[in-house]
Every structure is written in structure tokens, then in C-alpha cells.
């Protein structure tokens, strides 16, 4: 797995309380937590080749995806990636979030609808509200004394887990 190829400084590992105990995606959750306590680097040089195999050990991930490909009548019809439009919407949402962190009194619902359409805007508004984004925006605005600090606060709050939830919503 990807997690088997990670090198983690002991201080960072202790700061995030070690490997998360989950049924799947432990490496994703670990990297998500590590990104909040320090930089995550990508090693240069020879890459690690991960071979895939069919597996039902976990509810999602490479093993079940390989199983779907092998079970499909036409493997070319099985989606391998998230639709590119998801990332375009995600980019717009992050730009809006940056704007809102600088102007926390903005009408976020109106801007979501204006930039992303009524249906997507309403869905994202519900998800963000569920996460308590207004409180997060106020905190980011007050605590972030510089653009760099606000950006760091945004990336800490709007972490990889939340970004993936947005992609799955879309």
C-alpha cells in the first residue's frame, strides 16, 4: 500500500498520535493529519511501483476498484477517475472560501448560487453549514493576520478529507 512507502519523522508521527485505526485509507487519513502539523514532501528519485490486486478486505480503495474492473463486461466503461468538472467546481469553491475569509460578512449563499448554479450551490451550502463553516470563516478572519496565515488556516480547516467529501457530493 501507499502507507508502506511513507517515511515519517517520529515527532510528526507522535503529534498526530500515530496511524489511524480505520477499515481503509489509513494512509490518506495519516497524510491528512500530518499535513496539519508540518510540510509533507514528495521524494525524488526512483518511484515505488504498487501492484494492484482484487480484494474485498476494505470497503473502498484499490482492491475493490480492481474487482469492479475485473467483473465488468466492458472495463473501459468503468470510471477510473473523478470527473474533471469536480475539480473546476472545487477550485471555484476554494477561491470563494478565500474571498469569504477576507470578508466574513459576505452573502455566501448568493455567491455560491451565482458562481456554481442553484443546485450545486444549495448542495454545497448545506454541506458547508453542516461543517460549521461560518464559525471557521470568523476564526480564520480573526486569527489570520496575514494572507499566508489565512491561507494556512483555510488549508488546515478545508483539509483533504473535506475536499474529498466535496468531490463525492459533486
Locate the predicted segments by residue.
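Catalytic donor-sugar/metal-binding loop of nucleotide-sugar-dependent glycosyltransferases
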Residues: 22, 34-49, 55-56
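Acidic donor-binding loop at a coil-to-helix junction in glycosyltransferase catalytic cores
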Residues: 22-29
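PAPS-dependent sulfotransferase catalytic core
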Residues: 41, 53-75
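Generic structural hydrophobic/aromatic packing signal, biased to beta-strands
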Residues: 8, 30, 43, 48-50, ...
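Conserved nucleotide-sugar donor-binding
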Residues: 1-16
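Terminal low-complexity segments of carbohydrate-biosynthetic enzymes
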Residues: 67-170
Amino acid at each position: 500500500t501507499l502507507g508502506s512507502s511513507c517515511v515519517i519523522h517520529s515527532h510528526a508521527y507522535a503529534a498526530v498520535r500515530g496511524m489511524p485505526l480505520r477499515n481503509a485509507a489509513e494512509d490518506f487519513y495519516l497524510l491528512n493529519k500530518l499535513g496539519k502539523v508540518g510540510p509533507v514532501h514528495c521524494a525524488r528519485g526512483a518511484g515505488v511501483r504498487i501492484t494492484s490486486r482484487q480484494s474485498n478486505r476494505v470497503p473502498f480503495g484499490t482492491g475493490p476498484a480492481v474487482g469492479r474492473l475485473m467483473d465488468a463486461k466492458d472495463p473501459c466503461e468503468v470510471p477510473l477517475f473523478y470527473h474533471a468538472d469536480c475539480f473546476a467546481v472545487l477550485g471555484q469553491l476554494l477561491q470563494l472560501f478565500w474571498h469569504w475569509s477576507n470578508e466574513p460578512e459576505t452573502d455566501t449563499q448568493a455567491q455560491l448560487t451565482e458562481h456554481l448554479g442553484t443546485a450545486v450551490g444549495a448542495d454545497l451550502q448545506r454541506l458547508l453549514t453542516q461543517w460549521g463553516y461560518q464559525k471557521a470563516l470568523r476564526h480564520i478572519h480573526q486569527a489570520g493576520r496575514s494572507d499566508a496565515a489565512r491561507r494556512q488556516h483555510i488549508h488546515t480547516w478545508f483539509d483533504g478529507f473535506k475536499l474529498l467529501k466535496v468531490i463525492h457530493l459533486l
